Structure formats: C-alpha cells, structure tokens
C-alpha cells in the first residue's frame, strides 16, 4: 500500500491520507487533485508512507497538469509558520494555494525580460549602497531621507537578479502604492510586473500561480499575501516601507509578513532588501546586533533640500467655532496657492467627526456591537463603526433623553477639513483621499494621476497618503492634529507618531522648490516634535530603545497575547482567570487578564492576557503545553498573537 499525506488549503485542517494508484509516481511537494467533501481540490503531497490508520481512504485522482509542484523551501516555510505562529497547516496552505489551480488549463503569458534595462545613473552615495548590498548576504536596510532615491537603488539590485534569470518579489504595505511603482518599473525595465492583491480575480490568480510555478513570471509586486506565492527560483525579496504596521495581519492567521519574509529568504537563499526612511525599532535593533547591515542615504536625490518643519502652538491660536486650521497655516496655504504650488492637508481620521453626543444627558453614540464611538459621515449621512462596519441613521433627537436640538459633534475628520478648506479657498480644486473616498486601486490611481497632472490644488488625506507618493509640485504639508495617537498608552505610540509625521512631511518639496511642513499641536513641547523638526531619527531611536530596554519590552524580550472572546462577558472572564491560574511556572511574566482596549468587537466581549519572556525562551512550546492543560469551551474563541504589534 502506498499512501500520501495530502495537505489541503482548508482552514484548521491537518494532512489527510490518500491512496496512490499504481500508475502514479509522486514526490513530496507535488500538486495533486483529490476528492474532499464532495469537491475536487488541489493539494500538496506532504509526506509519503506505506500504511495508514484511517478506516476509509480515498484515492488520489491525478497529478496537476504540467507536473507543477511546491518547492521544498516553501514547504519548510509552511512548517515554520505553523510552529512559530501556532497555526494549523491547512490555514497556511490556503495562503500558498488560495484558489484551486487544478481546473482546466490556462494559457500562461511569459514575462519578456530584456537582457538590458534603461536605468538612470546613480549618485556616488547610491552606487556605494549597491556595492555594500552585493558584498554581504545579510538582510540589508536601505535607510534614507524621503526622496533620497531608495527605489532607484533597489531597481538596480533587481536588474542584477533578473540578469541571473531569478524571480523577484517586491512587497508593499498597501497595494495602493503599486501604481506609481509599476509605472516607474515599466519605464526602467520595459515590461509590466505581475500584481498580486485582493482585487485580482480568481481566473487571474490561477494564471499567475501557474506562471510562478513554471518560472514564467519573473517579477511580482504585492502586499502581505504575495509572500506565500510558490516561487521556485526566488532570488530577491524587497520589503518597501518595512516599518509599516500593515505588514502585520490581525485576522485569521496572525503573522508579520516582514519578519516571515526574512525567514523565507533564509529557506530560498534569497537576498533581502528592507527600505524605509523611518525603520522599525526591531530592524534598528537587528542592525545594532549585527543581524542586518545598514546603508544610509543622507541626501535627497539631486541634492534637493529637505523641507523646513514649523510647529504651530494651537494653545495660542484663537480659532472661530468649528474651525481647525490656524491663521498661520491658512496664510501659508494662500501663499502656496498663489505660487501655483500644491498643498497636502493631513489628518489621520476618516469621516466628518469622530463623536456625536447629547449636551443634555451626555449620551454618546457608540456601536451596538463594539466598544467604539460611531463616526459621523456627512457624505453618506450615516453614523458608522470603523471596526465592524455597523451603520445607523443620523438622529435628529437624543434616543436616550429624547431632547431635541441637543446633539453636537466633537472633533474633526477629513470631511470636516474638506468643508473648511472649501469655504476658505473656494476657487481651489480640492480632493480627498481615504479608504472611504478611494475604495479601489483604480480610484486611487485616478486621484494620483490628477495630482501629478496638477488637476488638484489641495489634497486632503489620511494615512494612505503618507506611503511613498511622489508629487514634485507639492511644497506645503499641513498636519491638522499632530497630537493624534501620541498620547495613548500603546507601547509603540511614540514610534508610530514619529514615523507618521516624518513620512507625511517627506511628501513636501520633492521637486525643484523647497518644501515646508506645519505641525499643529496643543502640546508643542512634545519631545517627538523636536526629533522630527531637526530630522534626528538616530537620537529618537536611541532614546526609544533605552525606554524599551528599561521596561524589558520588545525588541529586548519576546511577547505573546492570548485574546479570548465570546458573547458572555462573565463566562469569558472566568475562563481567562482559570487560564492564568493554571499557568505553568516558568521564567515568564504574565499580565492580565484585562479587558482588551477594544473590549467589545462585533458583539463579542474580549479579554487579553499578555506574556513576556526572555528572547531565548521557547515561548511557543510553553504556550502549547499551557493551553493543553485546559479545555476551551466552544462558546469561547481564543487567538494566539505572537509578537503583537498592538494591544487592542
């Protein structure tokens, strides 16, 4: 009897036994077609055996056409992911094979890679960066001020790998970034890279997967999930904007795509480039401990000056009611527009206002299913929860005390800033970019095209606009609320605020004219602003690392979170307490249980347990043993978050 254990791309499934027919020759990693629950699926040959304990064994139907297979390197990555992030093999296989490629054959278009490329001349600083990268196999961080030409450096590195016939993966935190990168790529290399994201159709994904497996696809640009594409000849992984939180997946499998990419590079013997003007503290730590190497660019491309940073003390501003732009900022915008230059107004808050409340009884409009305020969206005339998507109408009277004309809104969102800008600058062409206003890559591309062609005078945006866009005529950036996010209790609040302000400021003055950035703040003495103002990220990183070390928090320790959720708060809390009580004794620190910052989400109450351990401690082994000591009832969902980025 010949048995193959087949790994199917089905959540929470382990490899299943199937019988191999006499005429079928199989190797580990081969892709096969099998019957599973009244359907035919593509599976991976995970293991070969001569016997099975299963009572009924189905027979493998066939091998996938063209003898396609998953490399041993990708299989090793699946095993590592399952072990490190404590997730089921089937769930991870679903990332590698997100669709069934065993259906009728599809013609695969081969990328026509030229043997020459039109690449611009690098500066001496950039040439030195390429040389340093080539001389070591360590992951290399290209750290440079915004506009220093980091993309051009990794384009030159990509060219070297394409000349060797290798496959290349370019990872972006948001696929919204891809249009400008794609256009620049086509200009340099003469062919269009493959895009891998959630908007790609099933038919396209099937074609792309087959193209990758057959080595006909050479370059892919994608977000998190592109990391798991089954390359056979992967030579280079570029992780652009490596600091970005979007690389961490916070649903289904909880994993960090940046960190996993480093591991994939080890398995595939692929070289790694990380790029950022504001690297993560983890990456800075890895450089200081000599795990990564550093390339620093101190000059903008063509030696363009960095923008001036001006901090506006909002405690000294006397703003009219429902106004959020200071006189200093308004005057600066007027001058900028008179000079035919573009303006970016940044506020990392969607909608019109973050809170509606009753002045009579104090009632706050919160989500029925979450512990979150409902955000007013004037454009759609709705109150919306940005966590679960619940919407309701805008009330004319208070539903609690029934009083009329007592409802008021607090604080601005970008829709409110748009309204104010339209009143102040009625002749200007104003556009808004956020997840609400640009829901598709095509819409984002349209807005970017309008900005590049000077069809927009004032662009108002959320965090989406901070991610690497290049607008040569944009010379003024106004940050409406520079305090937003810096005063909460999150471990990484200071780091995120510094990165965000530095990144958004970097959109200004990328052409021939010097830029200026205005930060509006009610706490102008915040030390973060002083680092941003002088561009001293090294001192910021040093100070932040000292704070983390004193608190024994990452990157100086390991952390994991257990998130328990369910519809009965008392039952979930009881289970959480029981879990903590039976924790095996070890050299770990256990905090909690405590309500999660988002204590209710989509109708479920949430409690969190945080575990802190030494970097050499086997946290996964400890958690596996710990959780085996208790049976979790079906009404309680438990998630394990290894290396949590947030504690919401």
Swiss-Prot record:
Its cofactor is Zn(2+). Residues 393-548 form the Helicase C-terminal domain. Its EC number is 5.6.2.4. CDD domains: DEXHc_priA, SF2_C_priA. Keywords: ATP-binding, DNA replication, DNA-binding, Helicase, Hydrolase, Isomerase, Metal-binding, Nucleotide-binding, Primosome, Zinc. ATP binds at residues 144-151. Zn(2+) 1 binds at residues 358, 361, 398, 401. Binds 2 zinc ions per subunit. SUPFAM superfamilies: P-loop containing nucleoside triphosphate hydrolases (SSF52540). Disulfide bonds: none annotated. Zn(2+) 2 binds at residues 367, 370, 385, 388. GO terms for molecular function: 3'-5' DNA helicase activity; ATP binding; ATP hydrolysis activity; DNA binding; zinc ion binding. GO terms for biological process: DNA recombination; DNA replication initiation; DNA replication, synthesis of primer; double-strand break repair. Residues 131-297 form the Helicase ATP-binding domain. A motif (DEAH box) lies at residues 240-243. GO terms for cellular component: primosome complex. Component of the replication restart primosome. Initiates the restart of stalled replication forks, which reloads the replicative helicase on sites other than the origin of replication. Recognizes and binds to abandoned replication forks and remodels them to uncover a helicase loading site. Promotes assembly of the primosome at these replication forks. Belongs to the helicase family. PriA subfamily. This is Replication restart protein PriA. It comes from Rickettsia typhi (strain ATCC VR-144 / Wilmington).
């Amino acid at each position: 009897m010949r048995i193959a254990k087949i790994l199917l791309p089905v959540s929470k499934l382990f490899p299943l036994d199937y019988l191999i027919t006499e005429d079928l020759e199989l190797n580990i990693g081969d892709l096969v077609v099998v019957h599973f629950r009244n359907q035919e699926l593509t599976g991976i040959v995970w293991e070969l055996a001569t016997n099975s304990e299963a009572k009924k064994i189905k027979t493998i139907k066939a091998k996938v056409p063209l003898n396609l297979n998953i490399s041993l390197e990708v299989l090793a990555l699946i095993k590592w992911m399952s072990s490190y992030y404590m997730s089921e093999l089937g769930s991870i296989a679903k990332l590698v094979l997100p669709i069934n490629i065993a259906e009728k054959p599809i013609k695969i278009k081969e990328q026509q890679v030229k043997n020459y490329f039109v690449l611009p001349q690098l500066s001496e600083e950039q040439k030195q960066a390429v040389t340093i990268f080539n001389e070591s196999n360590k992951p290399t961080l290209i750290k440079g001020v915004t506009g220093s030409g980091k993309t051009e450096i990794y384009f030159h590195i990509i060219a070297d790998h394409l000349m060797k016939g290798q496959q290349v993966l370019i990872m972006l935190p948001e696929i919204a970034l891809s249009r400008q990168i794609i256009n620049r790529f086509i200009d340099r290399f003469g062919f269009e890279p493959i895009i891998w994201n959630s908007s790609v159709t099933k038919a396209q994904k099937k074609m792309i997967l087959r193209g990758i497996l057959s080595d006909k696809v050479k370059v892919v640009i994608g977000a998190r999930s592109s990391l798991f594409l089954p390359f056979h000849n992967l030579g280079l992984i570029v992780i652009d904007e490596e600091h970005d939180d979007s690389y961490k997946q916070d649903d289904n499998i909880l994993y960090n795509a940046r960190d996993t990419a480093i591991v994939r590079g080890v398995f595939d013997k692929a070289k790694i480039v990380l790029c950022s003007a504001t690297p993560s503290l983890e990456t800075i730590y890895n450089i200081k401990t000599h795990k990564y190497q550093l390339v620093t660019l101190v000059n903008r491309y063509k030696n363009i000056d960095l923008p001036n940073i001006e901090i506006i003390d909002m405690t000294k501003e006397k703003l009219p009611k429902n106004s959020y732009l200071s006189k200093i900022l308004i005057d600066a915008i007027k001058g900028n527009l008179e000079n035919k230059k573009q303006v970016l107004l940044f506020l990392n808050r969607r909608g019109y206002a973050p809170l509606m409340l009753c002045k009579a009884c104090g009632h706050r409009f919160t989500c029925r299913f979450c512990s979150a305020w409902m955000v007013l969206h004037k454009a759609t005339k709705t109150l919306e929860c940005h966590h679960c998507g619940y919407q309701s109408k805008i009330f004319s009277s208070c539903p609690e005390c029934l009083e009329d004309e007592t409802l008021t809104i607090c604080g601005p969102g970008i829709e409110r800033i748009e309204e104010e800008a339209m009143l102040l600058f009625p002749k200007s062409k104003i556009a808004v970019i956020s997840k609400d206003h640009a829901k598709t890559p095509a819409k984002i591309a349209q807005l970017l095209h309008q900005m590049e062609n000077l069809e927009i005078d004032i662009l108002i945006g959320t965090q989406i606009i901070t991610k690497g866009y290049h607008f040569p005529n944009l010379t003024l950036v106004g940050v409406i609320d520079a305090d937003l996010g810096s005063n909460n209790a999150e471990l990484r609040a200071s780091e995120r605020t510094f990165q965000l302000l530095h990144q958004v400021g970097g959109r200004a003055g990328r052409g021939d004219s010097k830029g200026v950035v205005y930060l509006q703040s009610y706490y102008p003495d915040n030390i973060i602003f002083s680092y941003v103002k002088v561009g001293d990220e090294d001192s910021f990183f040093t100070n932040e690392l000292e704070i983390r070390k004193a608190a024994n928090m990452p990157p100086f320790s390991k952390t994991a979170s257990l998130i328990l959720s369910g519809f009965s708060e008392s039952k979930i809390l009881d289970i959480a307490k029981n879990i903590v009580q039976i924790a095996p004794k070890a050299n770990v620190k256990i905090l909690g249980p405590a309500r999660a910052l988002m204590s209710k989400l989509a109708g479920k109450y949430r409690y969190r347990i945080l575990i802190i351990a030494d970097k050499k401690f086997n946290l996964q082994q400890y958690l596996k043993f710990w959780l085996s000591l208790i049976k979790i009832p079906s009404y309680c969902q438990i998630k394990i978050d290894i290396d949590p980025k947030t504690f919401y």
